[in-house]
Amino acid sequence: INGGLLFGLNMAGISGAVDMIKGEFSLTDSGLGTVAALLTFGCLIGALFTGTFTEKFGRKKVMIITAVLYIISAFGCALAESATMLVVFRVLSGLAVGATSVVAPMYISEIAPAHSRGRLVSLNQFAITIGIVLAYIFDYLLIGFGYNAWRYMLAVPGFFGVLFLLFLIVKFPESPRWLLAHARRDEAVKVLNSIGGNALVTEELPAMESTLIAEQKKDK
């Protein structure tokens, strides 16, 4: 859910800041459009390569990296002293958004019990919408902070990123499916047991193992 909120906050957070950014860096309309649109370019790159990284390093590690990118990009945008700096951090923000669009649904589908999987994936999508709404609310509340209000607007996702990172480190286990795929069965059992007890282990583990075996045969 945190990932969805950050997705929405980063997509919409700049909307209330565009006029101030244009004045701050004396941008033309096309230059301002480039600054705003480059987040989408970062999204494309992030979405393209995240799948490979999640298979190699694990879902949790990629989400931690994504949370760090959210923090760096948000505070980097807020502290930008030039349009070039702003562009660089906007692209980083896009990388995080693109990565989240891939890894968050993947993680939820692999760790949630079957009976609640669809609901949780839908909740992640709903969180994106909530993030967009929150971005507009924060922009409205911060508009009165004067000349540097745009910096505060762009910093907002950074604070949510810190919370996301703390939750990831403390609360979120690795995907049991990824653990199984990397010959770490005992750890996968522990994760499933911590989520739903022995009943979930009995229900999910055989299905995961049979799916992985089928995929390995297909790859051959």
Question: Predicted regions span which residues?
Answer:
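Transmembrane-helix signature of 12-pass secondary carriers
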Residues: 1-220
